[in-house]
Amino acid sequence: MSCQTQLLSASEAALGEDFLSALSTDLDNWALFLDIDGTLLDLAETPDAVAVPPSLPASLDHLSKKLGGALALVTGRGLDYADQLFSPANFPIAGLHGAERRDPDGRVHKAAETADFERLKAELVAATASWAGVLIEDKGAAVAAHYRLAPDRQLELEQLMEWALYRAGPDWAIQHGKMVVEIRPARANKGDAVAAFLGQPPFAGRRAIAIGDDVTDEAMFRTVNRLGGLSIRIGPPVPASEALGSIPSAEALRGIIAALALLNI
């Protein structure tokens, strides 16, 4: 029975944790794609408040080497910010849900920032200046409105972002996440970013494992499932999710990564 069949037929989707532990016997045939917030790192009240456990960058770097470099971060964060989080380790990254990407060979692809979009971001900051707890995050070619500290503002903020999307035009799309609404380039999604990596060495020819925690990760779940890979969600199983398995928490995933990184294989 294949690992994928086991995940699909298991009564407890938490079998994903056992599967990742089994990677140690077949690292040469897998590629690993990891979301950051809520997946590698615990969610925080604001984007800048996330804490990176001191040992995590080195654990990821060791695991990447065991995978022959076939480990990439796929995140809503921008490339530069993601690099700061895991410095001095350096990985292929798809940022802004795929609007930015650094290939394994170091080439960087970025969406263009326009003057009109810069003005729109400034208007969003001004419109929410008196909304205590609401945070507008400038991501360059994307903008996110966070309401984790102001949940009562959700409806108003969603309406404001729909207005902003109309102003931005057809080249942009709205993305909902955990206590956040984001406007990003319409052509960008995590599924396409994973597919692009899988067309390049060292990812090419390997089966993909995608791990995420949010609706923003569903696109990469669908992509890896379609390609015969495995999708794993952080948190309790959710019937509406495309994920084939689950791991209870970001802390549990970090423990698995640390264990894999330490194996003498």
Swiss-Prot record:
InterPro entries: HAD-like_sf, HAD-SF_hydro_IIB, HAD_sf, OTSB-like, Trehalose_PPase. The lineage of its organism: Bacteria, Pseudomonadati, Pseudomonadota, Alphaproteobacteria, Hyphomicrobiales. Pfam families: Trehalose_PPase. Its cofactor is Mg(2+). One of its GO terms (biological process) is trehalose biosynthetic process. Removes the phosphate from trehalose 6-phosphate to produce free trehalose. The active site is at D35. Pathway: Glycan biosynthesis; trehalose biosynthesis. This is Probable trehalose-phosphate phosphatase. Mg(2+) binds at D35, D37, D213. The keyword ATP-binding does not apply. Substrate binds at D35, I36, D37. It comes from the Bacteria. It catalyses: alpha,alpha-trehalose 6-phosphate + H2O = alpha,alpha-trehalose + phosphate. GO terms for molecular function: metal ion binding; trehalose-phosphatase activity. Keywords: Hydrolase, Magnesium, Metal-binding, Plasmid. Belongs to the trehalose phosphatase family. Its EC number is 3.1.3.12.
